[in-house]
Amino acid sequence: MTRHDFVEPYYMVQLSDDDLQEMQTYISKLKNRDYHHREIIHNNPIHSQGTDVYRTCEIHYPNKNSILNQIGKKIFLDVNEKYYEYDLKDIFEFQLIKYYVGGNYNWHCDYGEAPVRGSVRKLSMSVHLTDPKEYEGGELNLINYSNYPIMVNNNLG
């Protein structure tokens, strides 16, 4: 295994056509009841009303045996082995997030409560599963080592 002296804060990985198709097939079989509405409001004294809507979306949490989990876990393990070599335990949490017109997820650092107490999120992933020609917005911004934001292309998969 090759050790890397310098590790980027992010890597772009493209899903295989087969993996993308399997994920889209899984998604096409979901019903509205499989999603949970999620709206988070936080205090913002600068905003005229004192609060901001931080996140408005529908979320599906796939079960551990789903194809979404299997493919996502495979990607995490491959990227980790190639670039990071973290000690990953078998703790993976995936969210399938669906946005409607007006939905949003404001700028945030991608950390939060781990699904298992005492564990720490080491890797995070974002995959666009809808053709970017079918929507506006959805830009993903990341911070590079120079502390500058970069916008990631909204490529499918």
Identify the role of each PLM range.
Residues 77-157:
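Catalytic core of non-heme Fe(II) oxygenases with the double-stranded beta-helix
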